[in-house]
Structures are given as structure tokens and as C-alpha cells.
């Protein structure tokens, strides 16, 4: 979550007249994240999240994102729910941006996830994949293999100013991924951005997932690979195999991986690291000074890329044979 677009109380009040959520008592911007502008609203009826969709978010995708949240909730998954306006729509206009309000999800994200948190996230992710199996809408992943090289080309010229040799490293990784990216793996709705700040907990209990604005239709095991990158590396960039095993155990206890998915996991994990390095690198080089946004260091994912190059099997991530379907 982040804030790119400032709003004032007058225009917010006019926007809220289209909703039946009580009287506004306070609001504040949420600085974390990089994509859209987000505000926490407190009203006489409760707490809500207001999102203004910035230029990276295609308005045509909003029915998919908001409809997915509704669908998953109906299937029993805890996640924010879009608040319907008085005219029956879910999307309005505020400060020249498409905007929506969703319910507030109780809980906190874990800055230092434990093994128990990792297992709960893996289990929750598998439940999300199953719950989304009959979601009727589809959305192409706009940040997958065919998109990585064009994105890289936007930053390539300046990449070595961030880390000497980064151009050569990234070119080699992209060449490898283009030659080895798996085909014909099970696909469905994936979150695609399930970082610790997008999973809320009450103690060790998972209270739900948020921020579905990268959700799309893609390889299910790729979502697992994203989580291995996001949840199982320590501050010193070492991979915590115990956390990886817990996350994979949680996932496969609900949805076992096929043998093909297990074999592809090392390529998918390497690809996920490249994907997040590329978007972080682009933001690092282009987000304007003074923007109310916390930029994220692309080098965190360069170090993950280096780790994945050494992996030879999914067992090194902690995958146990009982988690693989015969």
C-alpha cells in the first residue's frame, strides 16, 4: 500500500456521500507499498480501506480484482470485501482516479515471520487456490516471463549503477528462464504478491490475505515460489530451509504438488526472484523524490537470484516427498 495521490477532506466527504458507511471521523494515508494510493478511513460505522487506483492499475482489471475478493469470501477465505455504493457500483471516481472502498481486515502483518506463520501461509495459499478454482473470470499475468525482458530494458542502461555486474547477471538469468520456463503446469487464480505485509495474523492464526491487485490467472506453483522468496529468507539473505519446509508442508497438506510442479519449483523460484528484482529496480531508478512511498531495495532480490542459481532440486527448498502427488 502507498500514497501517490493526496486528497482533502472536502473531496473525500463528497465521495463518501455515495456510500452508506456512516460519518467520517478521521483518515490517514498508508505509506507502505508501491502501486496504488491507500487511505485508512475511520467512520461511525467502523474502519475501511480506500484505494485510489494509479496508472499502473488498468481500470478494466478492477472488476476482476473486486469480483475475486467477493468470490473468495463466499468460499470461506478471509479477505477484504468491496463496499457497494448506493448506486450498486463498486467503483467510483476520486481526485481524477478510479477508487473503491473495502472492508478492514483485523490483524497485523508479521515483520519477523516464524515457522508457524510460514506453515499457516502455505496452508492459506492452497485454500485460496482451491477456492478460486471456479472463479469465472480470467486475467493475464502482466508481470510474467514475456514481460520481464521489456521491463528489464527500461532499467538496463542504469542497472550497473546499482550493482556492478548486474547487467550481465540479469541477462544470464533471463536467458536461462526463457529456455527453461515450464509449460503445461496446473493454472488458476493466484495472488502473485503474497508478501508478509499482505497476510494478517492474530497471534499465530492467519486472519486473512489482503491486496489482490496483482491477482491473475497463472501457474499455481508460481504462487508458491513467490512465497518461498518472500517468507523464507532471513535478514542476512540466507535461505531458512526450516521455514521453507513449513510453508511447503502447509501448502501440500491441502493441495499436494504434482511431480511436474515439484520439478519446476527451482525454475519458478528463480523466475519469481527476477520478477521482483526487476520491478524494484525500475522503481528504485524512477520513483520521484518526495513521493510518499517507501522504495524497496532491488539488491535483496539480486541476492535471492544468486541463491536460486545454486539449487538443484525442490528438496533443497524443504519439499518433502509426501507433499508430492504420486
UniProtKB/Swiss-Prot annotation:
Keyword Amino-acid biosynthesis attributed: yes
**What Pfam families does the record point to?**
APH (PF01636)
**Which InterPro entries is this protein grouped with?**
Aminoglycoside_PTrfase, Homoserine_kinase_II, Kinase-like_dom_sf, Pseudomonas-type_ThrB
| Pathway annotation | Amino-acid biosynthesis; L-threonine biosynthesis; L-threonine from L-aspartate: step 4/5
Which domain of life does this protein belong to? Bacteria
Catalyzed reactions per annotation: L-homoserine + ATP = O-phospho-L-homoserine + ADP + H(+)
Protein name in the entry: Homoserine kinase
- What organism does the UniProt record list as the source? Brucella abortus (strain 2308)
